[in-house]
Amino acid sequence: MALPWYRVHTVVLNDPGRLIAVHLMHTALVSGWAGSMALYELAVFDPSDPILDPMWRQGMFVIPFMTRLGVTKSWGGWSITGETITNAGLWSYEGVAATHIILSGLLFLAAIWHWVYWDLELFRDERTGKPSLDLPKIFGIHLFLSGVLCFGFGAFHVTGLFGPGIWVSDPYGLTGNVQPVIPAWGAEGFDPFNPGGIASHHIAAGILGIIAGLFHLSVRPPQRLYKGLRMGNIETVLSSSIAAVFWAAFVVAGTMWYGSAATPVELFGPTRYQWDQGYFQQEIERRIRTSLDEGLSLSEAWSKIPEKLAFYDYIGNNPAKGGLFRAGAMDNGDGIAVGWLGHAVFKDKEGNELFVRRMPTFFETFPVVLLDKDGVVRADVPFRRAESKYSIEQVGVSVEFYGGELNGVSFSDPATVKKYARRAQLGEIFEFDRATLKSDGVFRSSPRGWFTFGHANFALLFFFGHIWHGSRTLFRDVFSGIDPDLESQVEFGLFQKLGDPTTRKQAV
């Protein structure tokens, strides 16, 4: 009878050679997917407008990860920052994709070799002649090598000592570029938005990993601990590895969703909390106040606001606005942003400035309400016109634009004022091209949302996997009904007297 599908991995349980083969093949698939996905994204990516149509609006998933590690140029002659490039070198987007695909091919061949030549002397215990692995020693080797890699990344790549550095930006995602990072060794290194912490933590964790690896290579575990934690069982390795992976997945889901120096706004889009807290709106207001204090007019002050900053202050870029099961990039939802119309200022007929109440994240529709500076409702778009007291028509609301494409233009006809009041609910007002991609007008999430959703789900799945395999290996004797140390004693015909090791029969 064949193995059921959920037990097929038992074929590599006591077969170290083929255990290596399947891991090589898995790594080949991961590397091959990464390279292929990068080439696909590069084929559909439009780099022409990094301000209003950045990578995260186009639904790019692997390009942002390459960019944050220092890859910014393409063999196609463009750069992520907008410049024209003549010589991108090997480590361009296409170069990184190609090296992943080449690595995938080499790993594929290595997997086949190890599957065919599975029975190596290296995997056999000299004393018993049976297949066995010195798992504590292998753990030490892996810990040492990963420590070297971790230290090297922090000390050389991130710092620019031998490498490009990483993507570093200001708190508002306006000035991002790749640059070397100085390690932060003080308390400031624990600030999740400080890129210096990335360098220092990799250096520190790498040194710790190297020391721990050398310790496990030179010191054998006590026999009681070895048996208690089932260190001789490969399923123990599986369980603890799953634990490491699910913990990492939970951590990166958090750093992605809440934001950090490792997940910059320019590469992954804003977080939902930046909309909820009016983060970009407050920065825009601060800049306007500063400009007005310098003697500039309101029109001049708004004209100084970067279009990039205004675009962040738009609800359509909030990753929590797109439903998890709405497939496609943000551009497939509200469309490709074409231009900022300017900041809309509403006034009633008495000259009082009115502010449109913004839509909260988890609303699809929201009443259009205009308040004065004291928070008192002065105008609205009523549901029942017969009972209205504050309608746009009754209050005599007008709108004037400052900055952007409609700078200095004003409207007073109620239909137009209502149109812009509805759009002002969504933050700064932009013009969108919905024809090119046949965009349906329904908001989509950004790669920040997809990454978080995927990693949180897999982390939960792997958490249960850790519990499952940990229980199996710790309580194997209970589940099987036989103490693993008594297997030979209950084997029929091995002893003249069952279970008496002093009466072992000799092989003829």
Curated annotation (Swiss-Prot):
Family, similarity comment: Belongs to the PsbB/PsbC family. PsbB subfamily.
Entry's cofactor comment: Binds multiple chlorophylls. PSII binds additional chlorophylls, carotenoids and specific lipids.
Gene: psbB
Compartment annotation: Plastid, Chloroplast thylakoid membrane
Xref: InterPro entries: PS_antenna-like (IPR000932), PS_II_antenna-like_sf (IPR036001), PSII_PsbB (IPR017486)
Subunit structure: PSII is composed of 1 copy each of membrane proteins PsbA, PsbB, PsbC, PsbD, PsbE, PsbF, PsbH, PsbI, PsbJ, PsbK, PsbL, PsbM, PsbT, PsbX, PsbY, PsbZ, Psb30/Ycf12, at least 3 peripheral proteins of the oxygen-evolving complex and a large number of cofactors. It forms dimeric complexes.
Keyword Chloroplast among UniProt keywords: yes
Record key words, sorted: Chlorophyll, Chloroplast, Chromophore, Membrane, Photosynthesis, Photosystem II, Plastid, Thylakoid, Transmembrane, Transmembrane helix
Classification via NCBIfam families: PS_II_CP47 (TIGR03039)
A biological-process GO annotation: photosynthetic electron transport in photosystem II
Transmembrane regions: 21-36, 101-115, 140-156, 203-218, 237-252, 457-472
Protein name (database record): Photosystem II CP47 reaction center protein
Function: One of the components of the core complex of photosystem II (PSII). It binds chlorophyll and helps catalyze the primary light-induced photochemical processes of PSII. PSII is a light-driven water:plastoquinone oxidoreductase, using light energy to abstract electrons from H(2)O, generating O(2) and a proton gradient subsequently used for ATP formation.
GO molecular function list: chlorophyll binding; electron transporter, transferring electrons within the cyclic electron transport pathway of photosynthesis activity
Membrane topology classification: Multi-pass membrane protein
Highest rank taxon of the organism: Eukaryota
